[in-house]
């Protein structure tokens, strides 16, 4: 799996687990809804690290916790 797909799936899984909409994540993270939506829908590449940090803050997790999921075990470079 490509890194961008693993990041995308991880965000989707975390928002589903926490019953958080993209709109709510946008408000909590300070990242625009259009930016989040574009990434989740595969219209843009992986977010920059600082953007991912804000997304993690919006989800209430640490950045290192984000990457501990099994999705990242055999990830390939984009």
Predicted regions and their residues:
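Short alpha-helical DNA-recognition segment
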Residues: 20-38
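A short, Lys/Arg-rich alpha-helix, primarily the initiator
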Residues: 1-20
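Residues within the helices of the helix-turn-helix
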Residues: 12, 23, 53
């Amino acid at each position: 799996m490509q890194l961008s797909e693993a990041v995308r799936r991880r965000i989707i899984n975390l928002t589903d687990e926490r019953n958080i909409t993209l709109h709510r994540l946008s408000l909590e993270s300070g990242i625009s809804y259009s930016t989040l939506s574009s990434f989740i829908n595969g219209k843009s590449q992986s977010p920059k690290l600082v953007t991912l940090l804000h997304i993690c803050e919006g989800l209430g997790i640490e950045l290192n916790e984000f990457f501990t999921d099994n999705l990242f075990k055999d990830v390939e470079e984009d």
